[in-house]
């Protein structure tokens, strides 16, 4: 929004031309989202407490989690508000990348909100029925996938980038829609499964978003893209604004979500942030890289799949409890130890993912 105002004011003072630089707006976007989260966080927590919107804790979970019962949830509303305000202020509203991301965040945030509302306000422990949640996620993801495929302006927007291989970038054709669908829905649910400990999901989300900010910037410059053998995607630099807004909002939320948490993000936060990471990966053509950098999310998801599959096929569980972070809790690891070690793994995987841009 302010890009247009700055463009007009440049006629009178050339210093306003600085707003045309993505890097400058990205920094302002990060700071805006961060300050907004820190400023409004206490007010939201107080409001959630007054409304008695507290976390529902499963009775078969670790005993240490019983103390979390009643902790304010749906804090993802704070994250989404910070991201929306930041992106609307500093993003180029003429960019299709910006509107796609706002739709992703809004639609999946709405699905998560309905789920949270049924759990904590309606006191329905099951929340939104899994079948309906998946149907709504699928509708949103397919709408996005079809739109991106139909509006692709150059071949690079529908290629598949394969890490470690310099010139392996096959055209996907209609398979693009299938890959985009599974990436967005899968990432949304993976982050949702990871959000089980204080700060466990938000920090890896921030790390992956920061890495994608760099990748989006490189993809938007033809020289960097050609040098790194990644698709050149004109205009993808606007995704940097979205990514840094996620980083700022995430760090601001972590201030209140760190152990012991004052607020949880709820499904309204985890489903929308996960979908956002998936959508960004699709937009910059780095779906496989998301699997590497978001390895913590993948690990959590795979642990649930293995646990359920093993129990149904053999009648035995592989882990003491799934997702896998609960397994380590039941082994006696203190919650902060589990969280920090998963963060360390996430840092390693994000750096490994970035290294693949050059290791080809």
From Swiss-Prot:
Its cofactor is Mg(2+). GO terms for molecular function: metal ion binding; phospho-N-acetylmuramoyl-pentapeptide-transferase activity; UDP-N-acetylmuramoyl-L-alanyl-D-glutamyl-meso-2,6-diaminopimelyl-D-alanyl-D-alanine:undecaprenyl-phosphate transferase activity. It catalyses: UDP-N-acetyl-alpha-D-muramoyl-L-alanyl-gamma-D-glutamyl-meso-2,6-diaminopimeloyl-D-alanyl-D-alanine + di-trans,octa-cis-undecaprenyl phosphate = di-trans,octa-cis-undecaprenyl diphospho-N-acetyl-alpha-D-muramoyl-L-alanyl-D-glutamyl-meso-2,6-diaminopimeloyl-D-alanyl-D-alanine + UMP. The chain crosses the membrane at residues 26-46, 74-94, 97-117, 134-154, 168-188, 199-219, 236-256, 263-283, 288-308, 338-358. It is a multi-pass membrane protein. Pfam families: Glycos_transf_4, MraY_sig1. Its EC number is 2.7.8.13. Pathway: Cell wall biogenesis; peptidoglycan biosynthesis. Belongs to the glycosyltransferase 4 family. MraY subfamily. This is Phospho-N-acetylmuramoyl-pentapeptide-transferase. It comes from Shewanella sp. (strain W3-18-1).
């Amino acid at each position: 929004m302010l890009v247009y105002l700055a463009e007009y004011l440049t006629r009178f003072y050339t210093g306003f031309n600085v707003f045309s630089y993505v890097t400058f707006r990205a920094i302002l976007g990060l700071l805006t989202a961060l300050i907004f989260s820190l400023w409004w966080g206490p007010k939201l927590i107080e409001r959630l407490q007054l409304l008695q919107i507290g976390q529902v804790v499963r009775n078969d979970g670790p005993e240490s989690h019983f103390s979390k019962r009643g902790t304010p949830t749906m804090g993802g509303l704070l994250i989404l508000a910070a991201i929306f305000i930041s992106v609307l202020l500093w993003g180029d509203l003429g960019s299709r990348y910006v509107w796609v991301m706002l739709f992703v965040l809004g639609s999946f945030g709405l699905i998560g909100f309905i789920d949270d509302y049924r759990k904590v306000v309606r006191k329905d422990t099951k929340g939104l029925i899994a079948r309906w949640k998946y149907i709504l996620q699928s509708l949103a993801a397919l709408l996005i996938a079809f739109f991106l495929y139909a509006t692709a302006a150059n071949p690079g927007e529908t290629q598949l980038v394969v890490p470690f291989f310099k010139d392996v970038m096959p055209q996907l054709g209609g398979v693009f829609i299938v890959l985009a669908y599974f990436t967005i829905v899968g990432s949304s649910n993976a982050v949702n499964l990871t959000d089980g400990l204080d700060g466990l999901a938000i920090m890896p989300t921030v790390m992956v978003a920061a890495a994608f900010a760099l990748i989006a910037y490189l993809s938007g410059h033809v020289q960097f893209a050609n040098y790194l053998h990644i698709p050149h995607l004109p205009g993808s630099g606007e995704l940097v604004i979205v990514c840094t807004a996620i980083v700022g909002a995430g760090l601001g939320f972590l201030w209140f979500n760190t152990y012991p948490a004052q607020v949880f993000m709820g499904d309204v936060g985890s489903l929308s942030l996960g979908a956002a990471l998936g959508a960004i990966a699709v937009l910059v053509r780095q779906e496989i890289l998301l699997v590497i950098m978001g390895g913590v999310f993948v690990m959590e998801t795979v642990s649930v799949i293995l646990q359920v599959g093993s129990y149904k096929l053999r009648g035995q569980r592989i882990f003491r409890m799934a997702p896998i972070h609960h397994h380590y809790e039941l082994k006696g690891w203190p919650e902060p130890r589990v969280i920090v070690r998963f963060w360390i793994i996430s840092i390693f995987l994000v750096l490994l993912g970035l290294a693949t841009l050059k290791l080809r």
